[in-house]
């Protein structure tokens, strides 16, 4: 699973996702990709699951870029514990995603194969997404 090697602090504030993605909104590396249509949080397991779905469909051909990285920690308090007494323990990592953010890119396979692979990856993600093709193809 994806996770940062080292962080400055064990826990962090929750924060808010507001507005569209200012960076990472265009296809820069591949020819076709998946773009987020709504706010959400992608866990490292969801990112990896979608990557595996893409790789299994395109087999050995082509290259895949993952454009998001889970660098925010998710904390949880144990079940049946009263509120208060501090923040819960870290349990996993997630990537905050804003609308317009490109999540995955593919290059080196024909468009139909890439579209089918990305459609399979879309089913693994908890947010609405669309398939976008780089302009000029």
From Swiss-Prot:
GO cellular component terms attached to this protein's record: cytosolic large ribosomal subunit
SUPFAM superfamilies noted in UniProt: Ribosomal protein L16p/L10e (SSF54686)
UniProt keyword list: Ribonucleoprotein, Ribosomal protein, RNA-binding, rRNA-binding, tRNA-binding
UniProt key word NAD: no
Gene Ontology biological process: translation
One Pfam match: Ribosomal_L16
Listed PROSITE patterns: RIBOSOMAL_L16_1
Calcium among keywords: no
CDD domains recorded: Ribosomal_L16_L10e
GO function terms (MF aspect): rRNA binding; structural constituent of ribosome; tRNA binding
Cystines in this chain: none
Sequence similarity: Belongs to the universal ribosomal protein uL16 family.
Subunit structure: Part of the 50S ribosomal subunit.
Chain's role: Binds 23S rRNA and is also seen to make contacts with the A and possibly P site tRNAs.
Name of the featured protein: Large ribosomal subunit protein uL16
Native source species: Solidesulfovibrio magneticus (strain ATCC 700980 / DSM 13731 / RS-1) (Desulfovibrio magneticus)
């Amino acid at each position: 699973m994806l996770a940062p090697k080292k962080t400055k602090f064990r826990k962090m504030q929750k924060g808010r996702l507001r507005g569209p993605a200012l960076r990472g909104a265009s296809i820069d590396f591949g020819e076709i990709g998946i773009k987020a249509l709504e706010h959400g949080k992608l866990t490292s397991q969801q990112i990896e699951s979608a990557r595996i779905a893409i790789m299994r469909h395109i087999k050995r051909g082509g290259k895949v870029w993952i454009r998001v990285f889970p660098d925010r920690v998710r904390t949880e308090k144990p079940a049946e514990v009263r509120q208060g007494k501090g923040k819960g323990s870290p349990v996993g990592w997630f990537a905050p995603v804003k609308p317009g953010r490109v999540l995955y890119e593919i290059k080196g396979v024909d468009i139909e194969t890439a579209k089918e692979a990305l459609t399979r990856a879309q089913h693994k993600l908890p947010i609405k997404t669309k398939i976008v093709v780089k302009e000029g193809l």
